[in-house]
Amino acid sequence: MSTPTSNAIEIPNESAFSLKDFLSSFMLSELFKGLALTGKYAFRSKITLEYPEEKTPLSPRFRGLHALRRYENGEERCIACKLCEAICPAMAITIESEVRADGSRRTTRYDIDLNKCIFCGFCEESCPVDSIVETSILEYHGESRSDLYFTKDMLLAVGDRYEPQIAAARAADAKYR
């Protein structure tokens, strides 16, 4: 005959109550762990910046406000190939062109709707003459939607104003192109 096995569960003795259990029951150990973590970071140097007064350095590859560039002789670079318009996933670019007397094409209308633009940089990558670029300008605003609709003249003005910065950023990024 076999002996019966006991399936009884052993219950721990509840009368044995230590100081550690007492403190953890009041969650004081968690409180001290939190205070230790706070004290660890309280006296380190701060990494938060006060944004408008302090600015972080931007990468030369930062994609900000668009600009149209000109050649050194003052002629605009855009040859109206419309590759940027075709590749734009947000359909934010509108181009109209006409043929000049010398047989070359130039834009009569080059508009970018920054309300639609997703700043992907495809327009900049597709441009064969390096005409459309995204600058490192990140602080611009509009009080209405129409203020963020940039025409050809506005884009050329941005390019003319920031050409030294654009050229420096292009030179810094040249080995990666």
From Swiss-Prot:
Key word DNA-binding present: no
Disulfide bonds listed in the record: none
A Gene Ontology biological process term: aerobic respiration
GO annotation, cellular component aspect: plasma membrane
Chief localisation class: membrane
GO terms of molecular function: 4 iron, 4 sulfur cluster binding; iron ion binding; NADH:ubiquinone reductase (non-electrogenic) activity; quinone binding
Cofactor(s) this protein requires: [4Fe-4S] cluster
Domain 4Fe-4S ferredoxin-type stretches: 69-98, 108-137
Membrane topology: Peripheral membrane protein
Residues bound to [4Fe-4S] cluster 1: 78, 81, 84, 127
Reactions that this protein is recorded to catalyse: a quinone + NADH + 5 H(+)(in) = a quinol + NAD(+) + 4 H(+)(out)
Keyword annotations of the record: 4Fe-4S, Cell inner membrane, Cell membrane, Iron, Iron-sulfur, Membrane, Metal-binding, NAD, Quinone, Repeat, Translocase, Ubiquinone
SUPFAM superfamilies registered for this protein in UniProt: 4Fe-4S ferredoxins (SSF54862)
EC number: 7.1.1.-
Subcellular location: Cell inner membrane
Keyword Membrane: yes
Cofactor note: Binds 2 [4Fe-4S] clusters per subunit.
Residues the entry annotates as binding [4Fe-4S] cluster 2: 88, 117, 120, 123
Subunit structure as annotated in this protein's UniProt entry: NDH-1 is composed of 14 different subunits. Subunits NuoA, H, J, K, L, M, N constitute the membrane sector of the complex.
HAMAP family with a match to the protein in the record: NDH1_NuoI
Function: NDH-1 shuttles electrons from NADH, via FMN and iron-sulfur (Fe-S) centers, to quinones in the respiratory chain. The immediate electron acceptor for the enzyme in this species is believed to be ubiquinone. Couples the redox reaction to proton translocation (for every two electrons transferred, four hydrogen ions are translocated across the cytoplasmic membrane), and thus conserves the redox energy in a proton gradient.
Family assignment from sequence similarity: Belongs to the complex I 23 kDa subunit family.
The protein's name: NADH-quinone oxidoreductase subunit I
Originating organism: Albidiferax ferrireducens (strain ATCC BAA-621 / DSM 15236 / T118)
Gene for this chain: nuoI
